[in-house]
Regions:
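Structural preference for solvent-exposed beta-strand-turn elements
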Residues: 1-142
Length: 142
């Protein structure tokens, strides 16, 4: 087994600020649809998928604003039940709004996500979970 040994005369001190996790942030952003109260989020990473999810929430009627580096999401007037392909096609995480919309409104329409650079990642696990909860669904074109 290889190892890296570091020799130095000084103790390491200080602080670093790490970015939040994209894969943790995306489901949290989708879950904000479940409440009509304001949600305050800190330390979201500045990556394209997060920006796209924020745009998707806005398209569903969420009011979103930044105060410094914090994000405030207000879904008190969120009333749309359709997640368009234009936004969902660019990230796999778009499917994550399906459950919250279904819970909130009793029905929802979410375009299936587009392709993925790292290969096929079907959404069937989401559909199977919904079926086990008694949800019926239809997949159609357009």
């Amino acid at each position: 087994m290889q190892k890296l040994e570091v020799f130095g005369a000084k103790k390491l001190r200080g602080q670093i600020i790490i970015s939040g996790s994209k894969n943790a942030s995306l489901p949290i952003l989708a879950a904000t649809l479940l409440t009509n109260k304001k949600v305050y989020l800190k330390n979201l990473p500045k990556v394209k998928d997060i920006e796209t999810m924020i745009d998707l929430l806005k398209s569903l009627g969420s009011k979103i604003k930044y105060i410094k580096k914090d994000l405030i999401i207000d879904n008190s007037k969120q009333n749309k039940k359709f997640a368009s392909y234009k936004l969902v096609r660019t990230m796999r995480a778009g499917i994550l709004v399906l459950g919250p919309l279904l819970s909130k409104f009793g029905h929802a329409k979410v375009s299936l996500p587009g392709g993925c650079a790292i290969g096929t990642r079907p959404v069937d696990i989401h559909l199977k979970a919904l079926s086990k909860l008694g949800v019926s669904y239809k997949i159609s074109q357009g």
